[in-house]
Amino acid sequence: MKKGIFFLLVCFGLGFLPSCDTQKILTDPNLALQLENDSIVFDTVFTTRGSATEWLKIYNPHPGPIVIDEIFLAGKRYTGKSPYRLNINGQPVNEVADVELAAGDSMYVFAEVTLDPNGANAPLLVTDSIVFKRG
């Protein structure tokens, strides 16, 4: 009787092995990600040193996972300075590489800016770009 139950459990467990199929990563550079917004705007008045945070949501609408080769803050990379900081997919970094976004999944990019308006002419316009590179 114990051998019969053991045999059934083994057969039942083996039945699940074919379902553990990994999805092939989509490499076509023409497959675009969808962004909830194409701009992040901070409509905040700073009277003292302060910070504000906004977010951007990125979707993968395709039937397979996509790898984003790089996500980075352009000002920080090319000039070495930016008042912005990023939190990419839960990581407080200004750039990441090889981010896999599963089929139908999404991720958040949070942008925070810290400004000291003292001594500056108002209104203050500070810009930077978040760059997504694929393929």
Language model region names:
Residues 53, 108, 127-129:
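Short, conserved beta-strand segments of beta-strand-rich sandwich/propeller modules, principally
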Residues 48-56:
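Contiguous beta-strand segments within globular domains
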Residues 57-59, 112, 131-133:
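Residue-level recognition of well-ordered beta-strand positions that form the cores
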Residues 4-14:
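Sec-dependent N-terminal signal peptides
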Residues 21-41, 51, 61-117:
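Surface-exposed binding patches on compact interaction domains or structured appendages
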Residues 16-19:
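C-terminal motif of bacterial Sec signal peptides marking the signal peptidase cleavage site
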Residues 115-135:
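Terminal connector regions
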Residues 47-48, 103, 122:
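Surface-exposed loops/turns
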